[in-house]
């Protein structure tokens, strides 16, 4: 049944009786009438249209409400940021990350091998640590001078913020080198796999952070595995053990200081690590001279050269160069991947170092010791998953 339409103030009407007389507006823009079939027959059944109610048709031009539709050209001065990666770009990114990881692990394994060779012949970890930082600093200065890499733009505020990070990095670096000079490389890295436990404890009691229950539960295999590996280590040394533990604690504080102080800074990646190495070198040099001194270095150097031969010099150069390269690649990788992926990669790196050092140095290891190492590393993997 068709109902009447209320007209506007200037509308017109047509009465319907028996037959329909229609007055079509001169300019019809819109009609609310339903489409009726058989338009050729202009008569309507009386049962369809009410006899009493007239049908009013009004021109759309008389309606008070109008809709204005306009089109605007997009502002080309501000392009849309649509982050859509094509399949080729995704494949290239995955390949790039894979190359970073493979290079990172390979460089780290080579560094640990040469570092242990140097420390076996030249047991002076303070000088060895200093040479590693000095070599990296020199390499980056040459890269900046020759424009192989763009020099970072820094100011005094940047170096002030970097100072506590450099102090923690220096302590962690020296402590790890002291540990490797006293115990096997594999044992040092097994203990260093317990770094997540230090991270949670420091963040909880010093920074006031809280973590979900799975994070705390993941610490149990880490702590238990490290303890099992320590008590079953055949060549256990308290200095080597404490050096690895101090290194864990120092690197945790380094990460905290870096996260809080360096957030939003323009320097990142390899330039950030280069600046960190230079400041750490300035901090470490006077302490190295005070703890060991040139006289001990000269006597130890002559003894190492007489035992090893000229290859000893190349060992020192190799361990210094590869130390900087593997750290540089790790910082470059962190710019390309998520913290979770980096943490998993770091766990796999530690496994490769432990296995390679056992094979190359023929490190004696008991089954229960290997079980402790496996439990600790597996706990590190669980921690990286639970942290997310």
Curated annotation (Swiss-Prot):
**Phenotype on disruption:** No visible phenotype under normal growth conditions. Slight delay in seedling establishement, specifically in the process of cotyledon greening.
Q: Which GO terms describe its cellular component?
A: chloroplast; chloroplast membrane; plant-type vacuole
- UniProt keywords, alphabetically: Chloroplast, Membrane, Plastid, Sugar transport, Transit peptide, Transmembrane, Transmembrane helix, Transport
Question: What's an example Gene Ontology biological process for this entry?
Answer: photosynthesis
Its record classes its membrane topology as: Multi-pass membrane protein
Transmembrane annotation, as ranges: 95-115, 122-142, 158-178, 211-231, 233-253, 281-301, 305-325, 358-378
Q: Where does this one sit in the cell?
A: Plastid, Chloroplast membrane
Q: What induces it?
A: Induced when grown in high light conditions. Highly expressed in response to Pseudomonas syringae treatment.
**EamA domain sequence ranges:** 113-231
| Record-level Gene Ontology MF annotations | glucose-6-phosphate transmembrane transporter activity; phosphate transmembrane transporter activity; phosphoglycerate transmembrane transporter activity; triose-phosphate transmembrane transporter activity
So which tissues is this one expressed in? Expressed in seeds, flowers, stamens, and rosette leaves, with highest levels found in sepals and senescing leaves.
* Transit pept. (range): 1-68
Q: What PANTHER family does the entry give?
A: SOLUTE CARRIER FAMILY 35
| Protein purpose | Glucose 6-phosphate (Glc6P) transporter. Also transports inorganic phosphate, 3-phosphoglycerate, triose phosphates and, to a leser extent, phosphoenolpyruvate. Responsible for the transport of Glc6P into plastids of heterotrophic tissues where it can be used as a carbon source for starch biosynthesis, as substrate for fatty acid biosynthesis or as substrate for NADPH generation via the oxidative pentose phosphate pathway (OPPP). Required for dynamic acclimation of photosynthesis and partitioning of Glc6P between the chloroplast and the cytosol.
**Family according to the record:** Belongs to the TPT transporter family. GPT (TC 2.A.7.9) subfamily.
According to UniProt, the name of this protein is Glucose-6-phosphate/phosphate translocator 2, chloroplastic
Task: Give the organism, scientific name.
Answer: Arabidopsis thaliana
Tell me the gene name.
GPT2
């Amino acid at each position: 049944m068709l109902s009447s339409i209320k007209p506007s103030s200037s509308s017109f009407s047509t009465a319907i009786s028996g037959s329909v007389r229609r007055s079509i507006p001169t300019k019809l823009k819109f009609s609310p009438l339903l489409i009726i079939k058989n338009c050729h027959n202009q008569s309507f059944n009386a049962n369809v249209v009410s006899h009493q109610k007239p049908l009013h048709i009004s021109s759309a031009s008389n309606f008070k409400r109008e809709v204005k539709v306009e089109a605007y050209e997009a502002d080309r001065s501000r392009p849309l940021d649509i982050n859509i990666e094509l399949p080729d770009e995704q494949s290239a990114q995955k390949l790039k990350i894979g190359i970073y990881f493979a290079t990172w692990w390979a460089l780290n394994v080579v560094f640990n091998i040469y570092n242990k060779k140097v420390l076996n012949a030249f047991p002076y970890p303070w000088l060895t640590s200093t040479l590693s930082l000095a070599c990296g600093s020199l390499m980056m200065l040459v890269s900046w001078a020759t424009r192989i890499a763009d020099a970072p733009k820094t100011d005094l505020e940047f170096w002030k913020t970097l100072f506590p990070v450099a102090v923690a990095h220096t302590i962690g670096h020296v402590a790890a080198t002291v540990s490797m000079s006293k115990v096997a490389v594999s044992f040092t890295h097994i203990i260093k796999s317990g770094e997540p436990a230090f991270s949670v404890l420091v963040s909880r009691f010093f920074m006031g952070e809280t973590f979900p229950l799975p994070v705390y539960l993941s610490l149990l295999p880490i702590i238990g595995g490290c303890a099992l590996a320590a008590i079953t280590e055949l060549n256990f040394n308290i200095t080597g053990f404490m050096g690895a533990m101090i290194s864990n604690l120092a690197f945790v504080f380094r990460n905290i200081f870096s996260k809080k102080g360096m957030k939003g800074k323009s320097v990142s990646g390899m330039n950030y690590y280069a600046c960190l190495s230079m400041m750490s070198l300035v901090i470490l040099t006077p302490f190295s001279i005070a703890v060991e001194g040139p006289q001990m270095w000269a006597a130890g150097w002559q003894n190492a050269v007489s035992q090893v031969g000229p290859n000893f010099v190349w060992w020192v150069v190799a361990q210094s160069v590869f130390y900087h390269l593997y750290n540089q690649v790790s910082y470059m990788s962190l710019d390309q991947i998520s913290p979770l992926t980096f943490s998993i990669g770091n766990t796999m790196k530690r496994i490769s170092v432990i296995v390679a050092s056992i094979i190359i140095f023929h490190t004696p290891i008991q089954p229960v010791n290997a079980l402790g190492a496996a439990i600790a590393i597996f706990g590190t993997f669980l921690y990286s998953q639970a942290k997310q």
